[in-house]
Amino acid sequence: MSTLLIDLKGQTLRQEEVELLEHPLVAGLILFTRNFYDRPQIQALVKDIRQRVKKPLLITVDQEGGRVQRFRDGFTKLPAMQSFAALIQEPEQQLATAKEAGWQMAAEMTALDIDLSFAPVLDLGHECKAIGDRSFCSDAESVFRLASAFIDGMHAAGMATTGKHFPGHGHVLADSHLETPFDNRPSAVIFERDIRPFQRLIAQNKLNAVMPAHVIYTDCDDQPASGSKYWLQDILRRKLGFHGAVFSDDLGMKGAGFMGDFVTRSEKALSAGCDLLLLCNEPDGVVQVLDNLKLNESRPHFEARQQRLKTLFKKKSFNWTELTQTEKWLKNTQKLTALQAQWQSS
Protein backbone atom coordinates (compact mmCIF):
# COMPACT_ATOMS: atom_id res chain seq x y z
CA MET A 1 0.00 0.00 0.00
CA SER A 2 2.97 2.34 0.58
CA THR A 3 3.55 4.85 -2.19
CA LEU A 4 4.30 8.36 -0.84
CA LEU A 5 7.64 9.94 0.08
CA ILE A 6 7.25 13.06 2.22
CA ASP A 7 9.57 15.57 3.94
CA LEU A 8 10.29 16.92 7.41
CA LYS A 9 10.05 20.51 8.62
CA GLY A 10 13.28 20.89 10.55
CA GLN A 11 16.35 19.34 12.16
CA THR A 12 14.48 17.20 14.68
CA LEU A 13 11.61 14.74 14.31
CA ARG A 14 8.24 15.94 15.62
CA GLN A 15 5.59 13.60 16.99
CA GLU A 16 3.07 14.68 14.34
CA GLU A 17 5.66 13.74 11.70
CA VAL A 18 6.05 10.30 13.29
CA GLU A 19 2.29 9.84 12.89
CA LEU A 20 2.42 10.91 9.24
CA LEU A 21 5.34 8.58 8.52
CA GLU A 22 3.47 5.67 10.09
CA HIS A 23 0.49 6.19 7.75
CA PRO A 24 0.03 3.11 5.52
CA LEU A 25 0.38 5.20 2.34
CA VAL A 26 3.82 6.52 3.33
CA ALA A 27 6.79 4.57 1.98
CA GLY A 28 9.58 6.90 3.06
CA LEU A 29 10.92 10.43 3.17
CA ILE A 30 13.38 12.77 1.52
CA LEU A 31 15.80 14.96 3.47
CA PHE A 32 16.70 18.54 2.52
CA THR A 33 19.30 21.14 3.52
CA ARG A 34 16.86 22.55 6.08
CA ASN A 35 17.04 19.21 7.91
CA PHE A 36 20.84 19.47 8.18
CA TYR A 37 23.03 21.29 10.71
CA ASP A 38 26.11 19.08 10.85
CA ARG A 39 27.03 15.43 10.49
CA PRO A 40 26.35 14.33 14.11
CA GLN A 41 22.94 16.04 13.98
CA ILE A 42 21.85 14.43 10.69
CA GLN A 43 23.09 11.06 11.89
CA ALA A 44 21.07 11.48 15.10
CA LEU A 45 17.99 12.54 13.12
CA VAL A 46 18.12 9.46 10.89
CA LYS A 47 18.63 7.23 13.95
CA ASP A 48 15.63 8.86 15.66
CA ILE A 49 13.47 8.26 12.56
CA ARG A 50 14.52 4.60 12.41
CA GLN A 51 13.77 4.07 16.11
CA ARG A 52 10.49 5.96 16.44
CA VAL A 53 8.73 4.97 13.21
CA LYS A 54 7.64 1.37 13.58
CA LYS A 55 8.10 0.22 9.99
CA PRO A 56 10.86 0.15 7.36
CA LEU A 57 11.17 3.56 5.72
CA LEU A 58 13.05 4.36 2.53
CA ILE A 59 15.17 7.37 3.55
CA THR A 60 16.38 9.40 0.57
CA VAL A 61 18.22 12.61 -0.33
CA ASP A 62 19.51 14.52 -3.36
CA GLN A 63 23.29 14.30 -2.89
CA GLU A 64 24.25 14.39 -6.57
CA GLY A 65 27.37 16.53 -6.26
CA GLY A 66 28.12 20.08 -7.38
CA ARG A 67 25.32 22.49 -6.61
CA VAL A 68 22.85 19.76 -5.67
CA GLN A 69 24.36 18.48 -2.44
CA ARG A 70 22.08 18.77 0.60
CA PHE A 71 24.78 17.91 3.15
CA ARG A 72 28.03 19.87 2.80
CA ASP A 73 29.97 20.63 5.99
CA GLY A 74 31.71 17.46 7.14
CA PHE A 75 31.17 15.65 3.83
CA THR A 76 33.21 15.37 0.65
CA LYS A 77 32.59 18.34 -1.63
CA LEU A 78 31.56 16.27 -4.63
CA PRO A 79 32.27 17.71 -8.09
CA ALA A 80 29.60 18.77 -10.56
CA MET A 81 28.97 16.00 -13.08
CA GLN A 82 29.97 18.24 -16.00
CA SER A 83 33.48 18.59 -14.56
CA PHE A 84 34.56 15.02 -15.41
CA ALA A 85 34.46 15.54 -19.19
CA ALA A 86 35.18 19.27 -19.08
CA LEU A 87 38.33 19.21 -16.94
CA ILE A 88 39.85 15.73 -17.31
CA GLN A 89 41.44 15.04 -20.71
CA GLU A 90 42.13 11.30 -20.55
CA PRO A 91 38.87 9.33 -21.15
CA GLU A 92 39.85 6.45 -18.86
CA GLN A 93 40.65 8.91 -16.08
CA GLN A 94 37.25 10.57 -16.59
CA LEU A 95 35.56 7.21 -16.02
CA ALA A 96 37.73 6.32 -13.03
CA THR A 97 36.96 9.66 -11.35
CA ALA A 98 33.23 9.35 -12.05
CA LYS A 99 33.25 5.88 -10.47
CA GLU A 100 35.13 7.19 -7.43
CA ALA A 101 32.57 10.00 -7.04
CA GLY A 102 29.66 7.55 -7.21
CA TRP A 103 31.25 5.33 -4.57
CA GLN A 104 32.20 8.25 -2.29
CA MET A 105 28.71 9.74 -2.34
CA ALA A 106 26.98 6.41 -1.75
CA ALA A 107 29.39 5.29 0.98
CA GLU A 108 28.96 8.55 2.90
CA MET A 109 25.18 8.40 2.68
CA THR A 110 24.87 4.76 3.69
CA ALA A 111 27.19 5.51 6.63
CA LEU A 112 24.37 7.82 7.82
CA ASP A 113 21.85 4.96 7.38
CA ILE A 114 20.37 6.73 4.34
CA ASP A 115 19.22 4.31 1.64
CA LEU A 116 19.17 6.29 -1.57
CA SER A 117 20.46 9.41 -3.24
CA PHE A 118 18.52 10.22 -6.42
CA ALA A 119 21.31 9.89 -8.99
CA PRO A 120 22.56 9.97 -11.67
CA VAL A 121 21.22 12.76 -13.88
CA LEU A 122 21.04 11.45 -17.47
CA ASP A 123 19.85 14.66 -19.14
CA LEU A 124 21.86 15.95 -22.11
CA GLY A 125 23.37 19.42 -22.25
CA HIS A 126 23.77 22.40 -19.98
CA GLU A 127 21.38 25.08 -21.33
CA CYS A 128 18.43 24.19 -19.09
CA LYS A 129 18.63 26.30 -15.91
CA ALA A 130 17.26 23.46 -13.79
CA ILE A 131 19.94 21.06 -15.06
CA GLY A 132 23.07 23.01 -16.05
CA ASP A 133 26.25 21.40 -14.77
CA ARG A 134 24.29 18.55 -13.19
CA SER A 135 24.51 16.95 -16.66
CA PHE A 136 27.60 14.90 -17.49
CA CYS A 137 27.79 16.12 -21.09
CA SER A 138 25.78 17.22 -24.13
CA ASP A 139 26.20 14.04 -26.20
CA ALA A 140 24.45 10.77 -25.42
CA GLU A 141 27.51 8.52 -25.72
CA SER A 142 29.53 10.50 -23.17
CA VAL A 143 26.59 10.68 -20.77
CA PHE A 144 26.14 6.92 -21.04
CA ARG A 145 29.82 6.18 -20.39
CA LEU A 146 30.23 8.57 -17.46
CA ALA A 147 26.90 7.69 -15.87
CA SER A 148 27.70 3.99 -16.21
CA ALA A 149 30.95 4.51 -14.29
CA PHE A 150 29.23 6.63 -11.63
CA ILE A 151 26.61 3.87 -11.26
CA ASP A 152 29.31 1.22 -10.86
CA GLY A 153 30.64 3.24 -7.94
CA MET A 154 27.21 3.57 -6.34
CA HIS A 155 26.48 -0.14 -6.73
CA ALA A 156 29.88 -1.04 -5.24
CA ALA A 157 28.88 0.93 -2.13
CA GLY A 158 25.52 -0.85 -1.95
CA MET A 159 23.25 1.94 -3.18
CA ALA A 160 20.50 1.64 -5.79
CA THR A 161 20.49 4.04 -8.74
CA THR A 162 17.84 6.40 -10.13
CA GLY A 163 18.16 7.67 -13.70
CA LYS A 164 16.55 11.07 -14.16
CA HIS A 165 14.73 12.91 -15.72
CA PHE A 166 13.18 10.52 -18.27
CA PRO A 167 13.04 10.88 -21.27
CA GLY A 168 15.32 13.94 -20.97
CA HIS A 169 15.02 17.40 -19.38
CA GLY A 170 18.09 18.97 -20.94
CA HIS A 171 16.54 20.79 -23.90
CA VAL A 172 13.92 22.94 -22.21
CA LEU A 173 14.84 26.37 -20.88
CA ALA A 174 12.02 26.58 -18.33
CA ASP A 175 12.54 25.25 -14.80
CA SER A 176 9.91 22.67 -13.82
CA HIS A 177 10.26 23.78 -10.19
CA LEU A 178 8.56 27.01 -11.33
CA GLU A 179 6.38 26.12 -14.34
CA THR A 180 5.47 23.30 -16.72
CA PRO A 181 8.11 23.23 -19.49
CA PHE A 182 7.29 22.22 -23.06
CA ASP A 183 9.74 20.40 -25.34
CA ASN A 184 8.57 21.03 -28.91
CA ARG A 185 11.24 19.03 -30.73
CA PRO A 186 10.25 16.21 -33.10
CA SER A 187 9.85 12.86 -31.36
CA ALA A 188 12.53 11.38 -33.64
CA VAL A 189 15.13 13.72 -32.13
CA ILE A 190 14.20 12.77 -28.56
CA PHE A 191 14.42 9.06 -29.39
CA GLU A 192 17.68 9.44 -31.31
CA ARG A 193 19.42 11.51 -28.63
CA ASP A 194 17.88 12.13 -25.21
CA ILE A 195 16.47 8.70 -24.52
CA ARG A 196 19.65 6.84 -25.51
CA PRO A 197 21.45 6.91 -22.11
CA PHE A 198 18.31 5.56 -20.41
CA GLN A 199 17.88 2.91 -23.11
CA ARG A 200 21.46 1.64 -22.90
CA LEU A 201 21.66 1.64 -19.09
CA ILE A 202 18.33 -0.21 -18.87
CA ALA A 203 19.60 -2.77 -21.40
CA GLN A 204 22.62 -3.34 -19.14
CA ASN A 205 20.39 -3.62 -16.05
CA LYS A 206 22.16 -0.71 -14.37
CA LEU A 207 19.14 1.39 -13.35
CA ASN A 208 17.19 0.33 -10.27
CA ALA A 209 14.75 3.23 -10.63
CA VAL A 210 13.78 5.95 -13.09
CA MET A 211 12.38 9.41 -12.37
CA PRO A 212 10.37 11.00 -15.21
CA ALA A 213 10.40 14.71 -15.99
CA HIS A 214 7.61 17.20 -15.36
CA VAL A 215 7.95 18.14 -19.04
CA ILE A 216 5.37 17.95 -21.84
CA TYR A 217 6.87 16.59 -25.08
CA THR A 218 4.36 18.07 -27.49
CA ASP A 219 5.11 15.77 -30.44
CA CYS A 220 4.51 12.69 -28.26
CA ASP A 221 1.80 13.31 -25.65
CA ASP A 222 -0.22 16.12 -24.08
CA GLN A 223 0.66 15.10 -20.49
CA PRO A 224 3.93 15.65 -18.60
CA ALA A 225 6.07 12.51 -18.69
CA SER A 226 5.48 12.08 -14.95
CA GLY A 227 1.76 11.65 -15.64
CA SER A 228 1.92 10.01 -19.07
CA LYS A 229 0.94 6.40 -19.78
CA TYR A 230 2.60 6.81 -23.17
CA TRP A 231 6.01 7.54 -21.64
CA LEU A 232 5.85 5.32 -18.56
CA GLN A 233 3.97 2.29 -19.89
CA ASP A 234 4.32 2.26 -23.68
CA ILE A 235 7.92 3.47 -23.87
CA LEU A 236 9.65 2.87 -20.52
CA ARG A 237 8.04 -0.45 -19.59
CA ARG A 238 7.19 -2.01 -22.97
CA LYS A 239 9.64 -0.59 -25.50
CA LEU A 240 12.68 -0.26 -23.21
CA GLY A 241 11.81 -3.26 -21.04
CA PHE A 242 12.37 -1.48 -17.72
CA HIS A 243 11.34 -3.55 -14.69
CA GLY A 244 12.58 -1.31 -11.86
CA ALA A 245 10.80 1.30 -9.75
CA VAL A 246 9.39 4.54 -11.17
CA PHE A 247 9.47 7.62 -8.93
CA SER A 248 7.44 10.69 -9.72
CA ASP A 249 9.51 13.83 -9.46
CA ASP A 250 8.27 16.14 -6.70
CA LEU A 251 4.50 16.57 -7.17
CA GLY A 252 4.75 19.77 -5.15
CA MET A 253 6.68 21.45 -7.97
CA LYS A 254 4.90 24.05 -10.08
CA GLY A 255 5.62 21.91 -13.14
CA ALA A 256 3.22 19.28 -11.79
CA GLY A 257 0.41 21.81 -11.37
CA PHE A 258 -0.72 21.08 -14.92
CA MET A 259 -2.11 17.79 -13.58
CA GLY A 260 -4.48 19.36 -11.02
CA ASP A 261 -4.62 19.48 -7.21
CA PHE A 262 -2.38 17.29 -5.07
CA VAL A 263 -4.74 14.33 -4.89
CA THR A 264 -5.41 14.48 -8.64
CA ARG A 265 -1.67 14.78 -9.38
CA SER A 266 -1.04 11.69 -7.25
CA GLU A 267 -3.84 9.73 -8.92
CA LYS A 268 -2.63 10.67 -12.41
CA ALA A 269 0.99 9.77 -11.63
CA LEU A 270 -0.01 6.38 -10.21
CA SER A 271 -2.41 5.69 -13.07
CA ALA A 272 0.30 6.61 -15.59
CA GLY A 273 2.71 4.11 -14.08
CA CYS A 274 4.60 5.67 -11.16
CA ASP A 275 5.25 3.34 -8.22
CA LEU A 276 6.38 5.94 -5.70
CA LEU A 277 5.34 9.57 -5.37
CA LEU A 278 7.43 12.44 -4.01
CA LEU A 279 5.43 15.26 -2.41
CA CYS A 280 7.63 17.91 -0.79
CA ASN A 281 7.27 21.37 0.76
CA GLU A 282 3.48 21.06 0.82
CA PRO A 283 2.41 19.85 4.31
CA ASP A 284 -1.26 20.59 3.65
CA GLY A 285 -1.01 18.73 0.34
CA VAL A 286 0.45 15.70 2.11
CA VAL A 287 -2.51 15.61 4.50
CA GLN A 288 -4.94 15.96 1.58
CA VAL A 289 -3.33 13.01 -0.21
CA LEU A 290 -3.17 10.81 2.90
CA ASP A 291 -6.83 11.53 3.65
CA ASN A 292 -8.20 11.18 0.13
CA LEU A 293 -5.96 9.07 -2.12
CA LYS A 294 -7.54 5.73 -2.99
CA LEU A 295 -5.31 3.02 -4.43
CA ASN A 296 -7.43 1.01 -6.82
CA GLU A 297 -4.98 -1.69 -7.87
CA SER A 298 -5.01 -5.42 -8.34
CA ARG A 299 -3.19 -7.70 -5.95
CA PRO A 300 -0.49 -8.63 -8.53
CA HIS A 301 0.11 -4.94 -9.30
CA PHE A 302 0.35 -4.10 -5.59
CA GLU A 303 2.80 -6.94 -4.96
CA ALA A 304 4.96 -5.99 -7.95
CA ARG A 305 5.10 -2.37 -6.77
CA GLN A 306 6.07 -3.37 -3.22
CA GLN A 307 8.74 -5.72 -4.57
CA ARG A 308 10.24 -2.87 -6.59
CA LEU A 309 10.26 -0.72 -3.44
CA LYS A 310 12.22 -3.39 -1.54
CA THR A 311 15.04 -3.30 -4.12
CA LEU A 312 15.76 0.35 -3.29
CA PHE A 313 16.95 -0.10 0.29
CA LYS A 314 20.70 0.03 0.84
CA LYS A 315 22.62 -3.24 0.50
CA LYS A 316 25.63 -2.23 2.65
CA SER A 317 26.28 -0.09 5.71
CA PHE A 318 29.52 1.70 6.45
CA ASN A 319 30.68 2.88 9.85
CA TRP A 320 31.52 6.58 9.48
CA THR A 321 34.67 6.51 11.60
CA GLU A 322 36.02 3.42 9.86
CA LEU A 323 35.05 4.71 6.40
CA THR A 324 36.84 8.03 6.83
CA GLN A 325 40.05 6.30 7.91
CA THR A 326 40.31 4.14 4.79
CA GLU A 327 42.93 4.95 2.18
CA LYS A 328 40.24 4.87 -0.53
CA TRP A 329 38.05 7.49 1.15
CA LEU A 330 41.00 9.75 1.99
CA LYS A 331 42.37 9.65 -1.58
CA ASN A 332 38.93 10.21 -3.08
CA THR A 333 38.25 13.16 -0.78
CA GLN A 334 41.44 14.92 -1.83
CA LYS A 335 40.93 14.24 -5.53
CA LEU A 336 37.20 15.05 -5.73
CA THR A 337 37.43 18.19 -3.59
CA ALA A 338 40.26 19.50 -5.79
CA LEU A 339 38.23 18.81 -8.94
CA GLN A 340 35.22 20.71 -7.61
CA ALA A 341 37.42 23.65 -6.55
CA GLN A 342 38.92 23.71 -10.05
CA TRP A 343 35.43 23.59 -11.58
CA GLN A 344 34.17 26.47 -9.45
CA SER A 345 37.14 28.64 -10.41
CA SER A 346 37.00 27.80 -14.14
Swiss-Prot record:
Keywords: Cell cycle, Cell division, Cell shape, Cell wall biogenesis/degradation, Cytoplasm, Glycosidase, Hydrolase, Peptidoglycan synthesis
Broad class of enzyme this protein falls into: hydrolase
EC number: 3.2.1.52
One CC-aspect GO term: cytoplasm
Molecular function via GO: beta-N-acetylhexosaminidase activity
Pathway assignment: Cell wall biogenesis; peptidoglycan recycling
Active site: H177, D249
Site positions (Important for catalytic activity): D175
Location of the protein in the cell: Cytoplasm
Reaction(s) this enzyme catalyzes, per UniProt: Hydrolysis of terminal non-reducing N-acetyl-D-hexosamine residues in N-acetyl-beta-D-hexosaminides
UniProt GO BP: carbohydrate metabolic process; cell division; cell wall organization; peptidoglycan biosynthetic process; peptidoglycan turnover; regulation of cell shape
SUPFAM superfamilies xrefs: (Trans)glycosidases
Residues engaged in binding substrate: D62, R70, R134, K164, H165
Pfam families (alphabetical): Glyco_hydro_3
Domain of life: Bacteria
Function recorded in the entry: Plays a role in peptidoglycan recycling by cleaving the terminal beta-1,4-linked N-acetylglucosamine (GlcNAc) from peptide-linked peptidoglycan fragments, giving rise to free GlcNAc, anhydro-N-acetylmuramic acid and anhydro-N-acetylmuramic acid-linked peptides.
Protein family (similarity comment): Belongs to the glycosyl hydrolase 3 family. NagZ subfamily.
Alphabetical list of NCBIfam families matching this protein: PRK05337.1
Name by which UniProt lists this protein: Beta-hexosaminidase
